Amino acid sequence: MQVIRLAALSDNYIFLLHDSQKNIAAVVDPAEAEPVLKQLAQLNAELVAIFNTHHHNDHVGGNQQLIQNFPQLKVYGGAEDKGRIPGQQVFLQPGDRVQFTDRVAEVIFVPGHTRAHIAYYFPPQTADTPGELFCGDTLFAGGCGRLFEGTPAQMVESLTKLRSLPENTRVWCAHEYTLKNLQFALSVDSENTELQKRFDEVKTKRSQGIATVPSLLGVEKLTNPFLRWEQPSLQSAVNSNDPVQTFARIRGLKDKF
């Protein structure tokens, strides 16, 4: 399974999963249809599935046009998003499995950004290959999603689930927010040398127009303040020793950054 990253809108990423042997594809969070249709035409591939993480328009905006072009495809989303995802046919529960070609993804319930948000995790096929995590707007490179429908406690629980995955997991988040996220991270975790190093690397990449997605989960655990709420330096920065309160205060600062 090849993952093809497609740029969309102003800062979105759409992910096309392609099986070159069967010449079929699935798409994760099609913000718009045109980039997907263009890539499918280049591959001469049939689209068989849409995997939506949540209902926001910049993740489902392309659903209807893709359905019109490929009427046989199936649209997957969280069960609690029923009525909010265009064309949804499959209503996923936590722990469900979804299959694309020979790969099977675990459905992880990650409320916080929205009340129904899910992530799709494809475990590694061999010991030396990475797993693939499609996490929508729950976990970003260097950050996390705003809390529109969920609570800090829910988001901490959700991020704890994602944080427990193998460190070599590739994190395919849906936006190119990394540079600004790391600028904020330095404001609350300025002594973190791994973070300083990552910021410099990302700044160089973005100045050259290079994407910073995917990232590696192990790097996120060292540098992303929204996975580090137990760290004394971060707790001190927001004057709290409670993990959920620490997270909530960091999130509040980021909302105003």
UniProtKB/Swiss-Prot annotation:
InterPro entries xrefs: Clx_II_MBL, Glyoxalase_II_hydrolase, HAGH_C, Hydroxyacylglutathione_Hdrlase, Metallo-B-lactamas, RibonucZ/Hydroxyglut_hydro
Residues reported in the UniProt entry to bind Zn(2+) 1: 54, 56, 113, 137
Binding site for Zn(2+) 2: 58-59, 137, 175
UniProt xrefs under CDD domains: hydroxyacylglutathione_hydrolase_MBL-fold (cd07723)
Transmembrane segments: none
One Pfam family here: Lactamase_B
Molecular function terms, GO-annotated: hydroxyacylglutathione hydrolase activity; metal ion binding
Alphabetical GO biological process terms: methylglyoxal catabolic process to D-lactate via S-lactoyl-glutathione
Cofactor remark from the record: Binds 2 Zn(2+) ions per subunit.
Enzyme Commission code(s) on record: 3.1.2.6
Domain of life: Bacteria
Cofactor (UniProt): Zn(2+)
Pathway recorded for this protein: Secondary metabolite metabolism; methylglyoxal degradation; (R)-lactate from methylglyoxal: step 2/2
Keywords, ordered alphabetically: Hydrolase, Metal-binding, Zinc
Reactions catalysed: an S-(2-hydroxyacyl)glutathione + H2O = a 2-hydroxy carboxylate + glutathione + H(+)
Complexes and interactors: Monomer.
Family: Belongs to the metallo-beta-lactamase superfamily. Glyoxalase II family.
Known role: Thiolesterase that catalyzes the hydrolysis of S-D-lactoyl-glutathione to form glutathione and D-lactic acid.
Name of the protein this chain belongs to: Hydroxyacylglutathione hydrolase
Species annotation: Trichormus variabilis (strain ATCC 29413 / PCC 7937)
